[in-house]
Structures are given as C-alpha cells and as structure tokens.
Amino acid sequence: MSMTICSNTPGAYPEIGAYNEVDKQLESSGFSSDSSLILNKPEVRQYWSSVSSHISRSGDVFTNDKEKISSSIGEDAMDIDASPSLIEKYNSFPTRKILPEQDEFENDVEDDASSSLKEKSQGSCEIEIASEISSEILNGTSADGNSEFHDFAEPPPSQNESVALSFSQSNDLDFLNNPSGSGSSNDINRSTSSISLPRHVSLDFNVYNSLCLTNEVTASESHNVAKFHLGKENKKSLLPRWKTIEMYGEVVKKTQDIYSNFQYAQYILRVGLDTEKLHELVKELEDESNSFTVDSLKEYLVNDAKVILKKLSAVGYPDAQYLLGDAYSSGVFGKIKNRRAFLLFSAAAKRLHIESVYRTAICYECGLGVTRNAPKAVNFLTFAATKNHPAAMYKLGVYSYHGLMGLPDDILTKMDGYRWLRRATSMASSFVCGAPFELANIYMTGYKDLIISDPDYAMALYEKAAALGHTESARILEDARRSGGFVSRGHPPSAQKYHKTSHEAVAAKKLI
C-alpha cells in the first residue's frame, strides 16, 4: 500500500490506494526510496506553495462575500458577533440566590454553622442556563395564562455549578455536575437518590427499594445475618447495633462529604420511623444506665436527622431540601408545616430536582403553604412531565383532556392530554395506577374520528390498572365478568367525575 497525493487538487486529503506492483508504484509516485511517507524537499516546497495559494484564493472569496453581506445589512451589523460564547450568554443573566426563602427555616440551624455556610454558598455559586430555565417556572405565566417556557422542553443540566459543601472550614468546593446534586464531582459514577418518584427519597419506607439502600442499611442486614448464624448464645460477641449507629454518626459528622451526611440522615430517619427497629434497639439498651424508651429514642433520631437535613438544605443540597420538605408536609416533626415544605420544594425545584418540581405543582394546585394558582400549577406539571415524571404526565393528561385547571376545552388540548396519558400508561406503576384507567375510559367511547373506540384494548388497560392496585378498574372488571364480558359503552366513570355544570364552570373560572 502506498499513499499518493492528487496532483490536480492541491491541499486535498491524501488518497490511499492498494497496488499489486509495489516497486513500480514507488518509482512512479515521486516519493523518495527511503520511505513512502516522506516527500523530497522540492516536492514539499511545490506542494505547500500550491496549498497556500489555494487558501489565499478561498480567503478572497470569503472577503468578497462578506462585502456583499455588509453592503446589504450595514457595517455596524457586521461588526456585532451574532453568536456570543456560552459563557457570555450565561453570565448575562441576573444573579439569583439559590435559596431566597431560606430565612423561614434557617433560624433553627446553629448560628455558627449557618453563617459559614451562607458565605461559602454565596461566594461560590455561578448562574447557569439550567437555573435560568427553572426560575422561569416560578414567573413563567403570560397574561393569557399560558406557559412561557414551552420551548424549554428539554433544558440542559448544570455543568459548572459549584457550591460550598462543608459544615466548617474547608476548601472542598466540588459539586457533582448533575441536576440532582448527589455526591461529589470526584465520583461521577455515584448514583443519585432522586429518581423522580416519591418512594426513592421520601418517607414511604414500606416499599422495598434497592436504590434507597445506604451503607448503614447494608451493614444492618449483615448484622442480622451474623446474629442468625451465631445463634442466641453467641450473639453477645457482636457489637450492639446501637453502638455501631453511634460510631457511624460520629465518623460521618466529622467528614466534609455532603453525600455521606445525607445518607446518614436518611438512615436514622428511616430507623426513627420504623417501630420494629426501634423496639429492637430499645432491647439492646436495656442493660445500660441511660436506656431509651421507644418514644424518646424516636424523638432523638428524628431530631438528629432534622438538624443534619437543615444544614444540608442551607447549602442548597436539593435531595436534602426535598426530604426535609416531605417531612414537614407529612408531620414527621410534629405539626404539619406546609409553608416551610413549599419553600423547600420550590428551592429544590430551582435546582431542577424533578420530584420537587412536581410537589411544588401540587402545592399550587391544592393551596398548600401558598395561594392556589392554577396556571403556575400547570406550568410546573408541564416542566415535570417533559422530564418523564409519571405522576406529572398523568395529572397533565387528565387536566388537558377534560379541560380542567383553566386549560381550554378544544381538540388540540384534548389530543395533548391523550398523548400525555399514553406516555403515563407506558410508565404506570403502583404509585401511578390511574393512567391506564383514564386511557381505558377514552378508548371505551372514543373521541370523534380522532380516537377510534376499542373496547378490547380498553379491557386490557383495565386489567393493567387493576393489577397495579386501581380499585375502580377492578370493580369494572368484576361487573364485566358478572355480565358475561359485556361492558357498557356509555359515559365512563371519569367522564361523569370530571363533568362540570354551568355553575361549577363559572366558579372555576373565577377561582383561576
């Protein structure tokens, strides 16, 4: 094989050709006999002179084209750079605080810790295009009630965001470059615990989920397995479980790793809300002088988790903000505080925490901690739905198809709702089991000539919803079984549920 350069196209890419007679090609190609990839000096000068002349002619053509454009639009317009760099574009946005409403819940944090954290977070935070898009969610409603960020269906994640992570004096300012903000930038393979579903970083601990397992949870299971194999007589050779929790907490609190602190807070909150584990720990502490009762141990663990989550929330860690807001909204710390929960959800939503975006939409929809605002609720639901949040897709589909929450009752909106329900059905789970039911109701009756009625497919959707735990679908299947497989094709239950009288429609418009 030899490499030859076309003589008639100076400056072009080399041609590679395979020849059978290699010796003849070396003699006729003009290359030196030392190597087929080395040109002689005269050939080099001739080649590069032709290349330079070709480049100069191309530059003249570009200059002539530029003169023609400048003559048509003006010299001043040509001097302006039409495509500024991304850094200049990002820096042109007004600076916003990560947590503007943090005064509501930051007062309970220790003064020395919160002051140092504020200085670090304010000094190291850089505005991003993703945070600009998320801030448009809060103030993104036009005069006609429509969203102003429909073009931002897929916003880019943060790439250069840095936040002070430590609780004391530290030089560690690294932050994981993803919207949820879990872990550190030195470990890009560390998975985040915000997977846009309530059970992943929520207080619903009845459902087993491997994505929520921390190191301490794994150690607890290993401890139980060791006790089982050692037997009751030899189990005293193991370190008590409460002692390991205390040691783990002491080590974590001394570290500067924000992810480890969040894992520890999540674990002790899980233990504090699990009555069975609390009884096991109380039995281990019976022989000690400072033994706990079940209530006192629960209060101790929950308060310890609360302090850690507040510190993490003060530095803008979205997973901690969401978990703390979920605890406030569910009354884990005593009284339900919807206002604090809303502030935490909205703060995490500004950092593109998708589950927090959905919870903020629920707050605006139901008036939890904030005045009811249907357009803002629809805006938040739209943003969460575009990020594949199943519950947001389900709610947005229902509202769009039935013309609720101030959405127009026209054909285009109905078809948008139909498409959202189809996407939600493909991602249906035990938490979002209503999407197949609503889609089945649509296929039972159809819609004009756009959605053809298909009772067989509707029954399959009812079966899917019933298998996921939807009671109304199970009732419809039971009625069909009793009637010999016949299902009425009249108005489905959802159509009767969402049907509005004239007085209700007027009241809804006044509310919006």
Swiss-Prot record:
Membrane topology annotation: Peripheral membrane protein
Family: Belongs to the SKT5 family.
PANTHER family linked: CHITIN SYNTHASE REGULATOR SKT5-RELATED, PROTEIN SKT5-RELATED
Primary localization: cytoplasm
Name of the molecule in the record: Protein SHC1
Pfam families: Sel1
InterPro entries according to UniProt: Chitin_Synth_Reg, Sel1-like, TPR-like_helical_dom_sf
Spans of repeat Sel1-like: 318-353, 354-389, 390-429, 433-470
GO biological process: cell wall organization; sporulation resulting in formation of a cellular spore
Induction profile: During sporulation and at high pH.
Residue ranges of the region described as Disordered: 101-122, 144-165
Protein purpose: Required for the activation of chitin synthase III (CHS3) activity during the sporulation process.
